[in-house]
C-alpha cells in the first residue's frame, strides 16, 4: 500500500499538499489542468522532490526522505532517458546492475522482459536506431525488470500516435497485472485513463480535488468533470 499523509511541497512559497492512499496492485490515473501539480505529486512519490512536511509510506515503511535510488519505485517519463551510446540490452541491464555485470539469472530475466515487450530482436541496436515507440518499450522494460512494487508514468506515451499509444497502455496495464504492481499514471486524456484505470484522482491548485471512478468523470457527472472540460 502507498500512503501519503499531508505531503507538502512549497512551490514559490505556495504549498502543494497531498493526501492519498493507493492499494497494492491498483491502477490509478492522475488527471488535472496543466500546472495543477500532477508531475509534482509523482516526483514526491518517486523521491525526486523532498517534502517540507508530511509522511509517505510504502507497505507501512516510512519512505518520506528515502533517496530515489533506494525507494521501491520505478518511473517512466515522456523523455525516455535512454543512454544513446548503450545498446538496448545494456540500457535494460542498467535496471538490474548499474555496472552491467549481470549473472545468468539476471540475463534470463532481462531477455524475458525484452520478449514480453516485443523487443528481443532489437537488443544489439542503439536507441538512435529505434522508432519512438520502440524506445519507450525499452524504457518500460528497464522499469519492469527492476520488479519494484510501484510504477509511475508521467505521460510517457503522449507523443505517440493514438493507435500506438493505446497499444502501449494495454501493454503497461497487462504487465502491471502480471507482476502485481501498483500503477499511477499522469495523463491529460480521460479516455486514456479509462483504458487502464477504473479509479482516477483529479489534481487542481496543488491539491487532490476529487477521486473516484474514471467512468463517472468521463460521463460528466462528477464534480471535477468541468475541471477537465467534460460536460455532462
Curated annotation (Swiss-Prot):
Positions of ATP binding: 32-39
Protein name: Thiamine import ATP-binding protein ThiQ
Family stated for the protein in its record: Belongs to the ABC transporter superfamily. Thiamine importer (TC 3.A.1.19.1) family.
Membrane topology: Peripheral membrane protein
Top enzyme category: translocase
Superkingdom of the source species: Bacteria
Encoding gene, per UniProt annotation: thiQ
Catalytic activity: thiamine(out) + ATP + H2O = thiamine(in) + ADP + phosphate + H(+)
Location of the protein in the cell: Cell inner membrane
GO function terms (MF aspect): ABC-type thiamine transporter activity; ATP binding; ATP hydrolysis activity
Subunit structure and binding partners: The complex is composed of two ATP-binding proteins (ThiQ), two transmembrane proteins (ThiP) and a solute-binding protein (ThiB).
Keywords recorded for this protein, A-Z: ATP-binding, Cell inner membrane, Cell membrane, Membrane, Nucleotide-binding, Translocase, Transport
UniProt cross-references to Gene3D superfamilies, sorted A to Z: P-loop containing nucleotide triphosphate hydrolases
Function: Part of the ABC transporter complex ThiBPQ involved in thiamine import. Responsible for energy coupling to the transport system.
EC number: 7.6.2.15
Native source organism of the sequence: Escherichia coli O6:H1 (strain CFT073 / ATCC 700928 / UPEC)
GO cellular component: plasma membrane
Main location: membrane
Domain (ABC transporter) ranges: 2-230
Amino acid at each position: 500500500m502507498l500512503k501519503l499523509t499531508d505531503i507538502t511541497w512549497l512551490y514559490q512559497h505556495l504549498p502543494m499538499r497531498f493526501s492519498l492512499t493507493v492499494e497494492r496492485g491498483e491502477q490509478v490515473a492522475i488527471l488535472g489542468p496543466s500546472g495543477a501539480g500532477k508531475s509534482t505529486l509523482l516526483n514526491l512519490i518517486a523521491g525526486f522532490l523532498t517534502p517540507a512536511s508530511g509522511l509517505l509510506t510504502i507497505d507501512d515503511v516510512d519512505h518520506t526522505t528515502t533517496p530515489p535510488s533506494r525507494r521501491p519505485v520505478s518511473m517512466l517519463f515522456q523523455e525516455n532517458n535512454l543512454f544513446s551510446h548503450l545498446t538496448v540490452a545494456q540500457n535494460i541491464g542498467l535496471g538490474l546492475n548499474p555496472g552491467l555485470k549481470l549473472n545468468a539469472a539476471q540475463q534470463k530475466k532481462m531477455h524475458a522482459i525484452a520478449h514480453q515487450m516485443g523487443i528481443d530482436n532489437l537488443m544489439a541496436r542503439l536507441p538512435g536506431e529505434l522508432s519512438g515507440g520502440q524506445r519507450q518499450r525499452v524504457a518500460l522494460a528497464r522499469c519492469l525488470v527492476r520488479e519494484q512494487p510501484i510504477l509511475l508514468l508521467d505521460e510517457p506515451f503522449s507523443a505517440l500516435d493514438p493507435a500506438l499509444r493505446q497499444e502501449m497502455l494495454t501493454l503497461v496495464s497487462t504487465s502491471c497485472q502480471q507482476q502485481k504492481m501498483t500503477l499511477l499514471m499522469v495523463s491529460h486524456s480521460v479516455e486514456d485513463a479509462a483504458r487502464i484505470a477504473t479509479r482516477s484522482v483529479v489534481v487542481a491548485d496543488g491539491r487532490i480535488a476529487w477521486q473516484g471512478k474514471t467512468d463517472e468523470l468521463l460521463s460528466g457527472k462528477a464534480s471535477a468533470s468541468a475541471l477537465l472540460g467534460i460536460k455532462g
